[in-house]
């Protein structure tokens, strides 16, 4: 009799459990993948698409999955915090605990893995200055050269590292070099250096500007970041003499062939940055390969189940 009662109780419990989780509700595997990307001028997009093996999509929307969503770095971060079926990509320096960062080819996106070259999905942070003789006055020219030297110093490398990227050089302390730039010994509080270009580099650029100012006569700094392409246009390109001109422009991709008309000495790399595929925190996926990401962005994988069962 006790066995019969126990069996009946177990059947009742299973029945109640089935009723509490209706089988007609689609699971996560049936969710359509919502694909987010940067626009074609973005250095983040260029680095991501080339890194996953889908270079055709670096500057061409027509090869992407139908219905993709174009957004900037901050908007993609915000979207992944709420869109449980979304996927996008951002700079490692932008990643926080509101989203889930995916490993790439089984390797986590960390500064150590960028340095030891095991994390392959990365791109350069580069910068360009105005040409010699293309400054309002010599003070602005000398301040620009001093800033580039500061970025390359150990002090600059520390600022870059604190913002999540990996500096490519450390030439010694700024204190040991500042004497090479007499302009820094004078009061520069009436002078403004203008910075622009990649918005992925913005946090680093702002931090470098803030650290450089008191180290070089309290020069004023202004950061206005609108994309990697503008890093060239407003410094050496078609907008260099317009209202949006800049002294220094940043790019989160190597400058393209058509942007290399100026001398090599006007360009330099300041850091490497990992690019990270990101999803909602509740997404069960934790790692994707380049092939899987390519299939998602091509539209060959349209459901999360395609990825999970791959």
Label for each model-derived stretch:
Residues 19-310:
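Exported/periplasmic ABC-transporter solute-binding proteins
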